[in-house]
Design a protein with these regions (language model features):
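N-terminal and secondary-structure boundary signal
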Residues: 2-306
Length: 306
């Protein structure tokens, strides 16, 4: 059995205190940047297969099952990339079958509620439909599952203690207040950050002018990840976008790998995913910056393959 630091309860309580303080005219409470647990090699599961529901189950089973991450009564956010008005085969968004299978595992583990959302780049209604994610989630037909558009009234500005690029930003309260966050990016090339993986997928749960983050993208994403803790990261590499990311649009830029990567360590997951593009983790600035901040393990020799 793996032992993890559960930061969700900590973050939820500090945010609630911060909001109460702000309402009373006091300064917003700093959210402490919490480093990864020292002295333990984080587990990393990598599996291949063309049957996506089975692939998801086998990958999560290697991490002791979804029950290791989701407890009965938990409110869970499953955060895929739904940012683009692109169809499944173009690899701009997380594969809908990956999302559906993860949601089903959360329900089987006893989740009280599973919420799926993303702050899209293109029109949200088209993104949710064209990606195939809305139809896939709705096909589960459970009143414990909801796929939602972002409610822009639910962003709150919070201070980032020790921020390198920013000392405060707007965060989406439903993801902060959830008991568990499952971060489910698709692996893609990115014209600015080189790759867009789990770290960058967190941009879908922040407010404000996200373009400002691109001026110092590596440190900006580390700032965000120091506040938003992913309890489980699942990188969709069933097909990857090798060029012209993040939006893509050409089938010749897509490579089918039938691969899934999962870990409770967001940095380790991104580090391994970078190798699928022929890169070492040291060549991906977002991975390097996060590892230096103590947000996870970049050296793949220090992870425990399961």
């Amino acid at each position: 059995m793996m032992h993890r630091i559960d930061r969700r309860t900590f973050i939820r309580r500090t945010v609630q205190t911060a909001i109460a303080a702000a309402a009373g005219g006091l300064p917003v409470l700093d959210l402490l940047s919490m480093p990864a647990q020292a002295g333990q090699a984080p587990p990393l599961a990598v599996r291949k297969g063309q049957d996506i529901p089975l692939l998801v189950r086998e990958t999560i089973s290697a991490l002791d099952g979804m029950e290791n991450f989701v407890k009965p009564g938990d409110v869970v956010v499953v955060k895929p990339n739904i940012g683009w008005d692109r169809t499944v085969e173009l690899a701009a968004n997380t594969h809908p079958e990956v999302v559906k299978a993860l949601v089903q595992l959360c329900l089987e583990a006893g989740a009280k509620q599973v919420r799926i959302f993303d702050r899209t780049c293109n029109d949200e209604r088209r993104c949710y439909m064209q990606s195939g994610i809305r139809p896939a989630v709705e096909s589960i037909r459970s009143d414990r599952v909801s796929i939602e558009y972002i409610d822009r009234r639910s962003f709150k500005e919070l201070a980032i203690n020790g921020g390198r690029a920013f000392d405060r930003w707007e965060f989406y309260l439903p993801v902060i207040e959830a008991d568990r966050l499952i971060n489910v990016p698709v692996a893609k090339h990115h014209s600015i950050s080189r790759l867009t993986l789990a770290m960058k997928n967190l941009m879908g749960v922040i407010g404000g002018n996200r373009g400002r983050l691109h001026h110092n993208i590596a440190e900006s994403l580390s700032d965000i990840a120091s506040v938003i803790h992913s309890d489980l990261t699942v990188v969709d590499a069933t097909r990857i976008l090798t060029a012209n990311g993040p939006q893509g649009g050409r089938l010749q830029d897509v490579r089918k790998l039938d691969t899934l990567i999962a870990s409770p360590d967001i940095v380790a997951a991104d580090a391994y995913a970078s190798t699928l593009f022929g890169l070492s983790p040291e060549q991906v600035p977002t991975v390097v910056a996060a590892a230096r901040r103590g947000l996870g393990v970049m050296d793949l020799k220090q992870v425990r393959m399961v």
